[in-house]
Amino acid sequence: ISNGGDPMRARKAMAAVDKRLVRRDAQLIQLLDPPFDKSDLEPGYIKGYVPGVRENGGQYTHAAIWATTAFAMLGDKERTWELFAMLNPINRGSRPEAMERYKVEPYVMSADIYGATPHTGRGGWTWYTGAAGWMYRLSVETLLGLQLEEGHLRIAPCVPDDWESYKIHYRYRDTSYHIEIKCGGEKSNHATRVTMDGTVLNETGLIPLQDDRQEHHVEVMLR
């Protein structure tokens, strides 16, 4: 995520995450595996949790969101959206048996999800978690690609290949920007043209921001 690592090692690390920590059977993303319970190692307070709970081998949702962000930055759309579906709490309440297992509200983010029997898939803390803010950033900034920079918006999405278009209504102080992003198919993630109010502005994906108290209609073409 910091872009500070070697690209090849980053891909190897994320491949290991996918292989070792993504639990498709339980629809969760573990923080680590195996848990600290049978060794002399002392990693700190996390060893105080029973195996599979919170940071000791459960899903710690902050890290799960960061992992999903990392897959998006690597351009792995399929993996990104698969993990996003795991993170989305609404999917925990899609069936009565899933809700019975989850036991907490399916409309807010849970700080953690248990990763060991007999409580695998049970939600932990809700409401009181910064994971909600990170989920918002993943959804808006990384997936939809709406990134606020100094003086402008940058559009750099990671959306499924079968999306034809999507819209974002963005309010900048007293000015409204109605943005339609048109996708160009299989590898569409780079803006090729930005048009505002019928005038072509650039081919960089940048939308200049000006608080003129007007409504602007923006079209962004991706390839």
Question: Can you say where each PLM-predicted feature lies in the sequence?
Answer:
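Acidic, mature catalytic/reactive cores of soluble proteins
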Residues: 1-223
